């Protein structure tokens, strides 16, 4: 991954041909189908924006991964409130939802997922097109360690037995 960083770039999904999107294969069939069949429609309906990660190659750029972002909010829990010692605490916080994040099978476990999370954190905190205190996501059980290694924490303890866990990253940490 180290030597490839200069050859990576992220673009917003626009008019990429369906054939390019169809070639993308992560280990999750649902995420593959979303990119191919629903990502453009979600953008048209203002539900989420999809960003594509490409690797510049001599024989043509390769789609390595993608993620989606949308606006959201989270209701503060006692668990989270205990972590923030402020005079004023809010019931609800604006948040930016990472709805989907996928990396191609060929590039899994090589740092590309962490690269995307760093890019998301930097972009939303620096560009500030919209305010959001937290990045949030619903992590499936087998991805929780990955998100914890990337500084995400659990929003609540109450969902520990659920198939997904709500996790967050506090953008004030940047």
For every predicted segment, state its role.
Residues 136, 148-167:
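Conserved catalytic-core motifs of GNAT/GCN5-like acyltransferases
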Residues 99, 104, 140:
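Residue-level recognition of the GNAT/N-acetyltransferase active site
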Residues 59-100, 108:
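Conserved acyl-donor/pantetheine-binding loop and adjacent beta-alpha core of acyl/acetyltransferases
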Residues 117, 124-139:
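Conserved GNAT acetyl-CoA-binding A-motif
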Residues 109-123:
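Conserved acetyl-CoA-binding loop-helix of GNAT-fold acetyltransferases
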Residues 50-56:
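Cytosolic beta-strand hydrophobic patch enriched in CBS
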Residues 2-45, 59:
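Short amphipathic alpha-helix that is part of the acyltransferase structural core
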